[in-house]
UniProtKB/Swiss-Prot annotation:
Renumbered residue ranges of the record's region Interaction with membrane phosphatidylinositol 4,5-bisphosphate and RNA: 14-33
Motif residue range(s): Nuclear localization signal: 26-32
Domain Reverse transcriptase: 631-821
EC number of this enzyme: 3.4.23.16, 2.7.7.49, 2.7.7.7, 3.1.26.13
Name of one Pfam family that matches: zf-CCHC
Entry binding sites for Mg(2+) 1: 697, 772-773
Organism of provenance: Human immunodeficiency virus type 1 group M subtype B (isolate NY5) (HIV-1)
Lineage: Viruses, Riboviria, Pararnavirae, Artverviricota, Revtraviricetes
Protein name, per record: Gag-Pol polyprotein
Presence of the UniProt keyword Isomerase in the record: no
One of the GO biological process terms: viral penetration into host nucleus
């Protein structure tokens, strides 16, 4: 005892006995706990002496910790005791066991981190930087490695395939690891085609950049030598910063990780986009009754990633909703696992529950019961020298019999498996020729269409009679492998294959036995001579009579052969006759799974009437449908199907045959949407050159894939009769119909699954699959290649896909996807342009389509003038006269197409080069090649993305189109050769605001070169005449004026008709350009006009803008400036008076002076001025921009945190050595602030009581400053009934709002400080400005308006809530317009004078007051023990 007590000294023992066993508990540690621990350690063979030191305790803890997971409660108690003892030895103050365990965990984590850091340090000594893509070169400089085409390709593929689903965000994060803003912009520009998403992203980036500028103001004064300037928001976004600057910031000491910051902004934007593209809520994700648990979990987590919630909320969703929304089967299993189950345990437990896998397993179990190996009768002509392998009836193994079996005895009969008797007493002793148990009663062989069995049956074994024709009696040989009719009987082996045969004029039932050599029938008389014979069977040898050349009819097929007659227990048709009729035993692999299809929610199938058809069309349709029905593609239906789609027939091209067409437009509108598996067609320029090539075509592609059984009814159609002689013949599709929107996607999906095993087995063979066209290429010798092709054809045939010889191309040139492929080159299939005297709209559309197709290899093709002919809404048959330009364009294209042109195949080892030439009139042509004059492909670009553009902008768009096209075809971008000089390029892009990615390029001197036709000056031109221009128009009369006044006293006004304000502004600029010299200054107040001209367009769809461009090109120098409504520029007020007379109704000019005066006093933001003085936003913004005190930073955003109306945040800030106590109303951004003498509890409590006297304060949130935690403040809060919260980690009410308001307040104080003598005056002025002179945020109010609105709304909603709870106690019975029956009861939502609003189920309706009866809801009356209902029950 003494030895054990010596573990702790006196002082330590006192500490030990003060520590509680549990947090908040009464029991404390005693000496007995140390005695117990030392005894337990002896039990575990651990030295108890270790307890005397902290190091010994640490060693014991290290030994015990691994066993905690599996150990008993005693072991855990021992660990806890030693942990507390360790803390006492180490003099760590702890109050209870939990605190001691936390301290130990903290120490262990620290030691782990140190070890990891040490390991990382030793590993990283050799590396200078791991920050891809910025690396250190041999000279020690930090250089940038551009983002690779492979990474860009991966990113493009992700976006194209996932379409901004939640997976896009982690993928973007992974691909952009360590990237610079320039790399990130490159990634964004490669997916620039997604306009809506990119616009959302751009807005988010702009918002974040403005917020960055607000929080990081520019330091005044010059930058110190050796220091870098601080990045602005636009620098981080890569718009106004160079690559070198970005590298400098990222590698600076300390670094500014601009790449990571920009990446964070982009991810914020991507989150918004994902939310838009994935609108499904996590609450809507429920597991279907047959959906596998794995698929449900995939959907659940995919939607969870798109949810905008914190990680804690997401964890809660996973723990509760995942189980809650599972189907009943899985939910039962999941609940049994308990609350702490991991996802792995859940998925393992629910594996295979529900879904096709579960179904297949149940089916397999059923089959295993039916198909137990039974006795086998082998019938052979001669059994001599045959040795039978012995097989045990008990365990099923070969080599011993049941009597000698050592395995446990199997219950029941060894023959039939039933209990209650042994095998010797079994009644089922007859020879079983089927090798299956007699599981089903005898029945006739049923006719199944190939399509139905494929679509409906699970994994199956089938006996199939492959019929050719009734007269075919020759032995089946190699000549029979080719064509096979699809209307043969299929006899499944779920029951014995008994069929009716006709022999000697008699009908008999016989068993089809593929294991018997001969045909044996029971006693009967047959004509002709016979000879005696002995045959062996399971029951021994039997004597039979042999008849030769006997005619037998089996399943409608005739055969002549040898028949044996004798005492057989069952009639057997053996292989000697089965081979003649083409019978085979098939083991087909699982059929193509049908893809489940549904209609759009809330829609029903099509019910479109059949229109009348001519007699020849009806006859043709009847013939086609009869044949299709035989093949199982369609089935007849009765009148119970209410759906219908019109059907008609057209003649095939160059043929007398008819083709059936079904007008599925209405069904397509109602069918669910499908995701197209392939986003485009493969291009021959992307093919690698192969030694051997074959092109195959899948025959009747769609008709080989079954349609979902539940969807077939919607494909119903009717063939009418002439003069309605009889009711129409009704059919529905069993397979994918031509013309239905789901057929391409389902077929492609099925085909991909079928080809997958062949692709895996033959990785060296390239298979390009697009719909029913297959391109197969390999580097094998032609003989081996063709063997592989036959294997592929057989593989497809097993799944029911035929590849007709007619379309099997073995020799070049191969016709594929509209292309002509040769061994070493490719081209488009010959194109013949029609010669016509008159052209209809339809003719021109087809012509443009042909030319576009040809342009991918014929360089220089143009279609701009031909497309102009199609502008406007015209009927397809309308004749369009060709313009002179269009005729010339068509003639040029004919010349180009006269000479055949070929493209070559892609060589992965060589670089891609793209060269672009300008053709004029906004048209561009390009060639992509690897070797000069050997084009991979060519193309054209002629798209104008805006009304006004210039060549540089169009060239950029063309480059981006070619780069995207290259990534799709080859997975990388080419090097570009562009007809533009670097100087021209720089002159344009340094001024142009939009950041655009351009890949690597070089100048190539190919006339005509791209140039800028004019440039605007950046500063006013000294000595040039200045024109003040303006225009105005009346909206109602469309009358307007445009004019100018110059600084030299000239003026001019021109009246205009049928015009707009925008046109008059442009007209005024045109007048100034016309009447001015070679150098001119122009001042306008039109942002619209400024925006057009500053982009330096050189072509425009607008005639007026084109005229302005002509004038600009003639000038030597032009300076264009904008002013807000001519403020401060003498001549402009005159011109405004000139053009406004009798035109403008409302002028905002008067408001500008007042707004400027107010801004000089209060420095209001632009929203407040626009609202108070009725100014256009652009004018209000200009006033703010011209103020030297306001243009330093972006303005603050208010009202962005949505919180309860009673919550305030308090904080102290310091300025000029004084303390300012600030309170902010979180929901509105309203501020109360005061300069206090000292930062004490007394002053804070007094301020808090004043605040509570003015506003309803429910909660105050502060930091842990001594003045806020003082008893005085606590007493004040208690008295005023205010709840006090402090800034603890993970508290959702962070101090962020008050911190930003402090900065905002200081900023405003800085703006007005020179207007006040004392700081306390400036503080109150700043509070006034903030609360009443700044608008923005929620509702566009000022903070003062917003707090009043929030409090008033809170009172109203509380009152309204009381009214709602009262009104919900009423129920309404109502009548619809013409229905006399009273409906209801419905819930009363609102009662007005003339009508009531009610909710009936989920529908909300408005019912006139006269058609509604309102009654109070007293609840359901329950039947009591003595009520009439109970008495009736007793009777």
């Amino acid at each position: 005892m003494g030895a054990r007590a010596s573990v702790l000294s006196g002082g330590e023992l006192d500490k030990w006995e003060k520590i509680r066993l549990r947090p908040g508990g009464k029991k404390q540690y005693k000496l007995k706990h140390i005695v117990w621990a030392s005894r337990e350690l002896e039990r575990f063979a651990v030295n108890p002496g270790l307890l005397e030191t902290s190091e010994g305790c640490r060693q014991i803890l290290g030994q015990l910790q691994p066993s905690l997971q599996t150990g008993s409660e005693e072991l855990r108690s021992l660990y806890n005791t030693i942990a507390v003892l360790y803390c006492v030895h180490q003099r760590i103050d702890v109050k209870d066991t939990k605190e001691a365990l936390d301290k130990i965990e903290e120490e262990q984590n620290k030691s782990k981190k140190k070890a990891q850091q040490a390991a990382a340090d030793t590993g990283n000594n050799s590396q200078v930087s791991q920050n891809y893509p910025i690396v250190q070169n041999l000279q020690g400089q930090m250089v940038h490695q551009a983002i690779s085409p492979r990474t860009l390709n991966a990113w493009v593929k992700v976006v194209e395939e996932k379409a901004f689903s939640p997976e896009v965000i982690p993928m973007f994060s992974a691909l952009s690891e360590g990237a610079t803003p320039q790399d990130l912009n490159t990634m964004l520009n490669t997916v620039g085609g997604h306009q809506a998403a990119m616009q959302m992203l751009k807005e988010t980036i702009n918002e974040e950049a403005a917020e960055w500028d607000r929080l990081h103001p520019v330091h005044a004064g010059p930058i110190a030598p050796g220091q870098m300037r601080e990045p602005r928001g636009s620098d981080i976004a890569g718009t106004t910063s160079t690559l070198q600057e970005q590298i400098g910031w990222m590698t600076h000491n300390p670094p500014i990780p601009v790449g990571e910051i920009y990446k964070r902004w982009i991810i914020l934007g991507l989150n918004k986009i994902v939310r838009m593209y994935s609108p499904t809520s996590i609450l809507d994700i429920r597991q279907g009754p047959k959906e596998p648990f794995r698929d449900y979990v995939d959907r659940f987590y995919k939607t969870l990633r798109a949810e905008q919630a914190s990680q804690e909320v997401k964890n809660w969703m996973t723990e509760t909703l995942l189980v809650q929304n599972a189907n009943p089967d899985c939910k039962t299993i999941l609940k049994a696992l308990g609350p702490g189950a991991t996802l792995e345990e859940m998925m393992t437990a629910c594996q295979g529950v529900g879904g096709p896998g579960h179904k297949a397993r149940v089916l397999a179990e059923a089959m295993s019961q039916v198909t137990n190996p039974a006795t086998i009768m082998i019938q052979k002509g001669n059994f001599r020298n045959q040795r039978k392998t012995v097989k045990c009836f008990n365990c099923g193994k070969e080599g011993h019999i049941a009597k000698n079996c050592r395995a446990p005895r199997k219950k029941g009969c060894w023959k039939c498996g039933k209990e209650g008797h042994q095998m010797k007493d079994c009644t089922e002793r007859q020879a079983n020729f089927l090798r299956e148990d007699l599981a089903f009663p005898q029945g006739k062989a049923r006719e199944f269409s190939s399509e139905q069995t494929r679509a409906n049956s699970p994994t199956r074994r089938e006996l199939q009679v492959w019929g050719r024709d009734n007269n075919s009696l020759s032995e089946a040989g190699a000549d029979r492998q080719g064509t096979v009719s699809f209307s043969f009987p299929q006899i499944t082996l779920w029951q014995r294959p008994l069929v009716t045969i006709k022999i000697g004029g008699q009908l008999k039932e016989a068993l089809l036995d593929t294991g018997a050599d001969d045909t044996v029938l029971e006693e009967m008389n047959l004509p002709g001579r016979w000879k005696p014979k002995m045959i062996g069977g399971i029951g021994g040898f039997i004597k039979v009579r042999q008849y030769d050349q006997i005619l037998i009819e089996i399943c409608g097929h005739k055969a002549i052969g040898t028949v044996l007659v004798g005492p057989t227990p069952v009639n057997i048709i053996g292989r000697n006759l089965l081979t003649q009729i083409g019978c085979t035993l098939n083991f087909p692999i699982s059929p193509i799974e049908t893809v489940p299809v549904k209609l759009k929610p809330g829609m029903d199938g099509p019910k479109v009437k059949q229109w009348p058809l001519t007699e020849e069309k009806i006859k043709a349709l009847v013939e086609i449908c009869t044949e299709m029905e035989k093949e199982g593609k369609i089935s007849k239906i009765g009148p119970e199907n209410p759906y219908n789609t019109p059907v008609f027939a057209i003649k095939k091209k160059d043929s007398t045959k008819w083709r059936k067409l079904v007008d599925f437009r209405e069904l397509n509108k109602r069918t669910q949407d499908f995701w197209e598996v392939q986003l485009g067609i493969p291009h021959p320029a992307g093919l690698k050159q192969k030694k051997s090539v074959t092109v195959l075509d899948v025959g009747d592609a769609y008709f080989s894939v079954p349609l979902d059984k539940d969807f077939r009814k919607y494909t119903a159609f009717t063939i009418p009769s002439i003069n309605n002689e009889t009711p129409g013949i009704r059919y529905q599709y069993n397979v994918l119909p031509q013309g239905w929107k789901g057929s391409p996607a389902i077929f492609q999906c099925s085909m991909t699954k079928i080809l997958e095993p062949f692709r895996k087995q033959n990785p060296d063979i390239v298979i390009y699959q697009y719909m029913d066209d297959l391109y197969v290429g390999s580097d094998l010798e032609i003989g081996q290649h063709r063997t592989k092709i036959e294997e592929l054809r057989q593989h497809l045939l097993r799944w029911g896909f035929t590849t007709p010889d007619k379309k099997h191309q073995k020799e070049p040139p191969f016709l594929w996807m509209g292309y002509e492929l040769h061994p070493d080159k490719w081209t488009v299939q010959p194109i013949v342009l029609p010669e016509k005297d008159s052209w209809t709209v339809n003719d021109i559309q087809k012509l443009v389509g042909k030319l576009n197709w040809a342009s991918q290899i014929y360089a220089g093709i143009k279609v701009r003038q031909l497309c102009k002919l199609l502008r406007g809404t015209k009927a397809l048959t309308e004749v369009v006269p060709l313009t002179e330009e269009a005729e010339l364009e068509l003639a040029e294209n004919r010349e180009i197409l006269k000479e055949p042109v070929h493209g070559v195949y892609y060589d992965p080892s060589k670089d891609l080069i793209a060269e672009i030439q300008k053709q004029g009139q906004g048209q561009w042509t390009y060639q992509i090649y690897q070797e000069p004059f050997k084009n991979l492909k060519t193309g054209k670009y002629a798209r104008m993305k805006g009304a006004h553009t210039n060549d540089v902008k169009q060239l950029t768009e063309a480059v981006q189109k070619i780069a995207t096209e290259s990534i799709v075809i080859w997975g990388k971008t080419p090097k570009f050769k562009l007809p533009i000089q670097k100087e021209t390029w720089e002159a344009w892009w340094t001024e142009y605001w939009q950041a655009t990615w351009i890949p690597e390029w070089e100048f190539v001197n190919t006339p005509p070169l791209v140039k800028l036709w004019y440039q605007l000056e950046k500063e006013p031109i000294i000595g040039a005449e200045t024109f003040y221009v303006d225009g105005a128009a009346n909206r109602e009369t469309k009358l307007g004026k445009a004019g100018y006044v110059t600084d030299r006293g000239r003026q001019k006004v021109v009246p205009l008709t049928d015009t707009t304000n925008q046109k008059t502004e442009l007209q005024a600029i045109h007048l100034a350009l016309q009447d001015s010299g070679l150098e001119v200054n122009i001042v306008t107040d039109s942002q619209y006009a400024l925006g057009i001209i500053q982009a330096q367009p050189d072509k425009s769809e607008s005639e007026l803008v084109s005229q302005i461009i002509e004038q600009l090109i003639k000038k030597e120098k032009v300076y264009l400036a904008w002013v807000p409504a001519h403020k401060g520029i003498g001549g402009n007020e005159q011109v405004d008076g000139l053009v406004s007379a009798g035109i403008r109704k409302v002028l905002f000019l008067d408001g500008i002076d007042k707004a400027q005066e107010e801004h000089e006093k209060y420095h209001s933001n632009w929203r407040a001025m626009a609202s108070d003085f009725n100014l256009p936003p652009v004018v209000a913004k200009e006033i703010v921009a011209s103020c030297d005190k306001c243009q330093l930073k972006g303005e603050a955003m208010h009202g962005q945190v949505d919180c309860s109306p009673g919550i305030w945040q308090l904080d102290c800030t310091h300025l000029e050595g004084k303390v300012i106590l600030v309170a902010v109303h979180v929901a509105s951004g309203y501020i109360e602030a005061e300069v206090i003498p000292a930062e004490t509890g007394q002053e804070t409590a007094y301020f808090l009581l004043k605040l509570a006297g003015r506003w309803p304060v429910k909660t105050v949130h502060t930091d842990n400053g001594s003045n806020f935690t003082s008893t005085t403040v606590k007493a004040a809060c208690w008295w005023a009934g205010i709840k006090q919260e402090f800034g603890i980690p993970y508290n959702p009410q962070s101090q962020g709002v008050i911190e930003s308001m402090n900065k905002e307040l200081k900023k405003i104080i800085g703006q007005v400080r020179d207007q006040a003598e004392h700081l306390k005056t400036a503080v109150q002025m700043a509070v006034f400005i903030h609360n009443f002179k700044r608008k923005g945020g929620i509702g566009g109010y000022s903070a003062g308006e917003r707090i009043v609105d929030i409090i008033a709304t809170d009172i109203q909603t509380k009152e309204l809530q009381k009214q709602i709870t009262k009104i919900q106690n009423f129920r309404v019975y109502y009548r619809d317009s013409r229905d006399p029956v009273w409906k209801g009861p419905a819930k009363l939502l609102w009662k007005g004078e003339g009508a009531v609003v009610i909710q009936d189920n989920s529908d909300i309706k408005v019912v006139p007051r006269r058609k509604a009866k309102i009654i109070r809801d007293y609840g359901k009356q329950m039947a009591g023990d003595d009520c009439v209902a109970s008495r009736q029950d007793e009777d």
